[in-house]
């Protein structure tokens, strides 16, 4: 991928949602909700603070994250779909 986000933006690849319910029923693609978790693919160089210095981001490439339902902007690059969002849209980092 040849995308480099600017400032405090990050690029996220959604993690696939559940294919079936807890009861064992398969969920068709049209009924699935888009997952609200993903993997960070790329990060910007940081956000400028009050002193004009660039503060590094808390999230790193490879982090699994949770984000809000309406967070980010969907972009398509080379046939792959990604979300571009600000670090402020990230709700939590999933610890492994």
Curated annotation (Swiss-Prot):
A single GO BP: chaperone cofactor-dependent protein refolding
Chief localization: cytoplasm
UniProt-annotated location(s): Cytoplasm
UniProt keyword Endoplasmic reticulum present: no
Alphabetical keyword list: Chaperone, Cytoplasm
SUPFAM superfamilies from the UniProt entry: GroES-like (SSF50129)
InterPro entries attached to this UniProt entry: Chaperonin_GroES, Chaperonin_GroES_sf, Chaprnonin_Cpn10_CS, GroES-like_sf
Subunit structure: Heptamer of 7 subunits arranged in a ring. Interacts with the chaperonin GroEL.
Family membership noted in the UniProt record: Belongs to the GroES chaperonin family.
Superkingdom: Bacteria
One Gene Ontology term, aspect cellular component: cytoplasm
Protein name: Co-chaperonin GroES
GO molecular function: ATP binding; metal ion binding; protein folding chaperone; protein-folding chaperone binding; unfolded protein binding
Purpose: Together with the chaperonin GroEL, plays an essential role in assisting protein folding. The GroEL-GroES system forms a nano-cage that allows encapsulation of the non-native substrate proteins and provides a physical environment optimized to promote and accelerate protein folding. GroES binds to the apical surface of the GroEL ring, thereby capping the opening of the GroEL channel.
Name of the coding gene: groES
Organism name: Trichlorobacter lovleyi (strain ATCC BAA-1151 / DSM 17278 / SZ) (Geobacter lovleyi)
């Amino acid at each position: 991928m040849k995308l480099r986000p600017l400032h405090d933006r990050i690029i996220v690849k959604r993690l696939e949602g559940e294919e079936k319910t807890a009861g064992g029923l398969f969920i068709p693609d049209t009924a699935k909700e888009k997952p609200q978790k993903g993997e960070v693919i790329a990060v910007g160089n940081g956000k400028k603070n009050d002193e004009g210095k660039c503060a590094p981001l808390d999230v790193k490439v490879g982090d699994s994250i949770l984000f809000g339902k309406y967070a980010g902007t969907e972009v398509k690059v080379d046939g792959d779909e990604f979300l571009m969002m600000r670090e402020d849209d990230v709700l939590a980092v999933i610890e492994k």
